From Swiss-Prot:
It comes from Bacillus licheniformis (strain ATCC 14580 / DSM 13 / JCM 2505 / CCUG 7422 / NBRC 12200 / NCIMB 9375 / NCTC 10341 / NRRL NRS-1264 / Gibson 46). SUPFAM superfamilies: Ribosomal protein S6. The keyword Ribonucleoprotein applies. It comes from the Bacteria. The gene is rpsF. This is Small ribosomal subunit protein bS6. Gene3D superfamilies: 3.30.70.60. NCBIfam families: S6. The keyword Transcription regulation does not apply. GO terms for molecular function: small ribosomal subunit rRNA binding; structural constituent of ribosome. One of its GO terms (cellular component) is cytoplasm. Belongs to the bacterial ribosomal protein bS6 family.
């Protein structure tokens, strides 16, 4: 298993309860596929450098995980089709 850092931005027009549900859903996607979440950071609502899908703000979430490729691929696939996540990136950390 490798170490990854995952950052994703949740659309700003969701309420707090919906935001928690999105975070929980994507954490479960990783853990059910064998990943171990070592650290989570909620950066809160921040201004974007440029407009994405007509949004100027977003809720930033950062995860540090140890995972196999299949867990990261499944997260990436579902993040791409989710309407709640406006941008995401997965970075493989050097050993």
């Amino acid at each position: 298993m490798r170490k990854y850092e995952i950052m994703y931005i949740i659309r700003p027009d969701v309420d707090e309860e919906s935001k928690k549900a999105v975070v929980e859903r994507f954490n479960n996607i990783l853990t059910t596929n064998g990943a171990e979440i070592t650290e989570t950071k909620d950066w809160g609502k921040r201004r974007l450098a440029y407009e994405i899908n007509d949004f100027r703000d977003g809720f930033y979430q950062i995860l540090n995980v140890q995972a196999g490729a299949e867990a990261v691929q499944e997260f990436d696939r579902l993040a791409k089709i989710s309407d709640d996540i406006i941008r995401h990136i997965v970075v493989k950390e050097e050993e």
